[in-house]
Amino acid sequence: MLKVIKKYRKFITFLMIGLVYTLAYPATAHAMHIMEGMLPPRWCIFWYAVSLPFFIYGLYRMYKIVNSGVPNAKVMLALCGAFVFVLSSLKLPSVTGSCSHPTGVGLGTVLFGPGVMSVLGVIVLLFQALLLAHGGITTLGANEFSMTIVGPIVGYAVWKLCRAMKVSRSVSLFLCAMFADWSTYVTTAFQLAIVFPDPNGGVAAALIKFLSIYAITQIPLAIAEGLLTVIVYNLVISNDLWKESALQ
């Protein structure tokens, strides 16, 4: 454990700085994490019900990983959770009083597969909702579905497709993280559009409006997230702390 900490002391320092910053300057978010009270009760219940099977499967995957005996598995789980927390807490102003931020789910998706991200994501979402006024409890199901279910599944599909096509590991990982981020925001835009349809154009028009709002900041953020994810992943692999596809 001490060897791992020494090798990753710079990255751990970065994570701690991000943690201190987010705790010291909590800001209310109204973008990818749908805020408390934003959704009607029936939709809150619906998204909880839809997300529950994925969460249960994620618990099963988490149990298998923790008891797998694979070296550094627990450390890598903690790293992936911290990566999601720090990146998803780095909020940037967007339009109409909202904000945008990375999701950070690409790293864990590639290391462990999309299933475990539903559990890690819920832990992060609960922490942010309770301590950082970021998201909410009633909207937890909707936020979980977009960020920790759809995002990782899309990212994992992109990763597997790229690797099957013999695309380089770094490019595959970059595309995985980027598309996981974008698909999260597309899902959130759809979740809001069906609740707040445009008076004239309906759900389709509302979806276009929400997507156009998020795209201003989220497109460059997703690209930056992809690059950072590649750097961290290559750091992990190059130091022999993990093997590709070890527990996917």
From Swiss-Prot:
GO terms, biological process: cobalamin biosynthetic process
Database matches in InterPro entries: CbiM (IPR018024), CbiM/NikMN (IPR002751)
Family: Belongs to the CbiM family.
Pathway: Cofactor biosynthesis; adenosylcobalamin biosynthesis
Transmembrane segments: 39-59, 75-95, 107-127, 139-159, 173-195, 213-233
Main function: Part of the energy-coupling factor (ECF) transporter complex CbiMNOQ involved in cobalt import.
Membrane topology of the entry: Multi-pass membrane protein
UniProt-recorded name of the protein: Cobalt transport protein CbiM
Alphabetical UniProt keywords: Cell membrane, Cobalamin biosynthesis, Cobalt, Cobalt transport, Ion transport, Membrane, Signal, Transmembrane, Transmembrane helix, Transport
Keyword Nucleotide-binding: no
One example GO MF annotation: cobalt ion transmembrane transporter activity
Self-association state and partner proteins as the record states: Forms an energy-coupling factor (ECF) transporter complex composed of an ATP-binding protein (A component, CbiO), a transmembrane protein (T component, CbiQ) and 2 possible substrate-capture proteins (S components, CbiM and CbiN) of unknown stoichimetry.
Example of a GO cellular component annotation carried by this entry: ATP-binding cassette (ABC) transporter complex
Localization (cell): Cell membrane
Organism: Limosilactobacillus reuteri (strain DSM 20016)
Gene responsible for this protein: cbiM
Pfam family, one: CbiM
Signal peptide start-end: 1-31
Superkingdom to which the source organism belongs: Bacteria
